Design a protein with these regions (language model features):
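Hydrophobic alpha-helical segments of membrane proteins
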Residues: 129-137
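C-terminal helix-coil-helix/basic helical segment that borders enzyme active sites and/or dimer interfaces
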Residues: 65-79, 92-125, 138-146
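Conserved catalytic-core motifs characterized by acidic clusters
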Residues: 25-45, 67-81, 105, 139, ...
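FAD-binding core of flavoproteins
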Residues: 1-66, 76, 171, 178-179, ...
C-alpha cells in the first residue's frame, strides 16, 4: 500500500496484490470475467458522482448568489450587474439540466435497465456544471475566493477532480460516439 498525495480532502492510496491466490469458494462470479463485472458497476458509480457534482454546483451557486446580493460596490450589490449575474445564472441552468439527466439515469437504474448512456451523460453534464459553478463562484468572490476562510478554494480544487475521475470527459465522449451514435471506435 502506498499513499498518494493529492489536492483532495481525503486519503488516496495505491494497493498492490502480487501472487495472491483466491480460493474458488471466494470468487465473485466467473473467473476471468472480473473486468466485465467492474464495468457493470460503473453506471452506479457515475450516478453517484453526478449526484455529488450536482450538490457541489448547488453549493457554489448558493454561495455566489448570496455574496453577489450582499457585497456592495458604489452603494449597490455587485449582483445587480449582469456581468456578475449571468455566469451564476448559466451555472444554475447547467446544473438543473444535469440534474434532470441524473433523474433519468436513476430511474433506468432502479428499473434494472442499462443506464449506460444516461449515467455517462449525467456524470459529464454534472461535472461540467459543478466546474462552471465553481468558476463563477471564485470569480464572484474575487480575491476572497482564494481565502481558506470561505471554503471556496477547497471546494474549487475538489470540483476539478470530476472532470477527469472516475472517468474523463473524453472517455465519456468516446462512449457516446461509439455506443450511442454508432461511430467507429476511436481508440
Amino acid at each position: 500500500m502506498r499513499p498518494i498525495r493529492t489536492m483532495m480532502n481525503h486519503a488516496t492510496t495505491e494497493v498492490f496484490f502480487d501472487n495472491v491466490r483466491v480460493p474458488v469458494a471466494n470468487l465473485v462470479g466467473t473467473e476471468g470475467k472480473g473486468f466485465r463485472y467492474i464495468l457493470a458497476g460503473m453506471n452506479a458509480e457515475r450516478i453517484l458522482i453526478a449526484s455529488e457534482c450536482i450538490g457541489d454546483a448547488k453549493w457554489f451557486t448558493e454561495k455566489s448568489s448570496a455574496y453577489a446580493s450582499e457585497r456592495k460596490v458604489f452603494d449597490r450589490p455587485i449582483g445587480q450587474n449582469q456581468g456578475v449575474q449571468f455566469p451564476i445564472a448559466k451555472a444554475y441552468a447547467e446544473m438543473r439540466a444535469a440534474e434532470l439527466m441524473l433523474h433519468e439515469a436513476i430511474s433506468l437504474f432502479e428499473q434494472g435497465d442499462n443506464p449506460g448512456e444516461e449515467a455517462n451523460l449525467a456524470k459529464m453534464l454534472a461535472a461540467d456544471a459543478a466546474w462552471a459553478a465553481a468558476e463563477a463562484c471564485v470569480q464572484t468572490h474575487g480575491g476572497f475566493g482564494f481565502a481558506e476562510e470561505y471554503d471556496i478554494e477547497r471546494k474549487f480544487r475538489e470540483a476539478r477532480l470530476y472532470q477527469v475521475a472516475p472517468i474523463s470527459t473524453n472517455l465519456i465522449l468516446s462512449y457516446i460516439a461509439e455506443h450511442v451514435l454508432g461511430m467507429p471506435r476511436s481508440y
